[in-house]
Amino acid sequence: MVDFKTVQAFDFQGKTVVLRADLNVPMKDGVITDNERILASLDTIKYLLGHNCKIVLLSHLSRVKSLDDKKGKKSLQPVASALQNLLKNTKVHFCPENTGDKVKVAVNQLPLGEILVLENTRYCDVNEAGEVVKHESKNNAELAQFWASLGDIFVNDAFGTAHRRHASNAGIAKYIKNSCIGLLMERELINLYRLINNPPKPFVVVLGGAKVSDKLQVVNNLFKIADHILIGGGMVNTFLKALGNEVGTSLVEEDLVQTAKQILDSDKDKKIVLGVDQMLHASFKDEPGVECVVAPQWPAELQGFMSLDVGSKTVALFSSYLAKAKTIFWNGPMGVFEFSNYAQGTLAIGKAIAQNQQAFSVIGGGDSAAAAKQLQIADQFSFISTGGGASLALIGGEELVGISDIQKK
């Protein structure tokens, strides 16, 4: 049940709307390589434009850590251009600033039915002297008040940052009278709440990716709601080491080995299922690997090798659980997905989930979503989230602090 006010709660006619969208798209040399997040924000933008209002659009792009980062390579200008190409009949303006009098003037002069994209909100994380001040990322009150002062109504549609308390989401909501969530945010919450509120059983979760630390909270919370937690990717090595298995030079979070052991010891119902074999290579290279069964000791010729993907036995094991599932949540690749030799595990798991058309299946963003796209099976999943970290936080039982100050119904 989504208890926040939605866009349907307000009359936007003639108003100035501050819209926080998640337009954090991947770029290479100033060119957008995947516009999925821009496309995902269009429903809300078009809804607002249909109600004849001004839109002041805020978004972050990547992390900004230096003055060099503010010299154009992390600018939202290409995003504004992409938006203009998608909204042929709407004028999209770009403002190279995001605070100060120039912004106020630009907002005041903006005609109804047009959009003003302000510069990357994270430019405010580095001041003019080059000091890292994190005014956006640490929810600076003065910055939040300035952005709140620009509009009559705040619409937060940036699910990707819903788990972060930033000036451009939580901050604005605190200092503006009227606020609501956008259509994308509403869709995300409805689908993800289906996973945690009495999901059809069996509920199978697939976790991958490099780090255990990112997913510890989730694993602990999932014990309460999931039937099986399948663990692959780099994070499985920390669990395998905790059980006394050989991991060679694989990625392991040494400081969490003991924590992983405690999690496994407390798993009385044996909900956690670890990979049983791995694809190994002598170094971190995209070259064919060797399949090896998980064991306390690897063969002598594989000493010092590292795991770069799950093996075929793990794929078969995980697929057997996924075939019987009624609810599935998948977050994180099974191996080094960007290497073609080590993308097979991730692609196979994607196929296994897509084949189970009886299940309510959700992908938690990131590389898992990229895998579904690569396989051209994205439409066979019930829902693909736009926010990997935010979806994990919600499934992990955390409060989404970036939206908690939005007005309730």
From Swiss-Prot:
Gene3D superfamilies found in the cross-reference section: Phosphoglycerate kinase, N-terminal domain
Main location: cytoplasm
GO process annotations (BP): gluconeogenesis; glycolytic process
Compartments (UniProt record): Cytoplasm
Entry EC no(s): 2.7.2.3
Positions annotated to bind substrate: D22, L23, N24, R37, H60, L61, S62, R63, R122, R164
Residues given in the record as ATP binding sites: K215, E338, G365, G366, D367, S368
Keyword Cell membrane in record: no
Keyword vocabulary terms for this entry: ATP-binding, Cytoplasm, Glycolysis, Kinase, Nucleotide-binding, Transferase
CC terms in the record's Gene Ontology section: cytosol
Top-tier EC class: transferase
UniProt-recorded Gene Ontology molecular function terms: ADP binding; ATP binding; phosphoglycerate kinase activity
Pathway(s) per entry: Carbohydrate degradation; glycolysis; pyruvate from D-glyceraldehyde 3-phosphate: step 2/5
Catalytic activity: (2R)-3-phosphoglycerate + ATP = (2R)-3-phospho-glyceroyl phosphate + ADP
Self-association and partners: Monomer.
Entry's family note: Belongs to the phosphoglycerate kinase family.
Protein name according to UniProt: Phosphoglycerate kinase
Organism: Mycoplasma pneumoniae (strain ATCC 29342 / M129 / Subtype 1)
Lineage: Bacteria, Bacillati, Mycoplasmatota, Mycoplasmoidales, Mycoplasmoidaceae
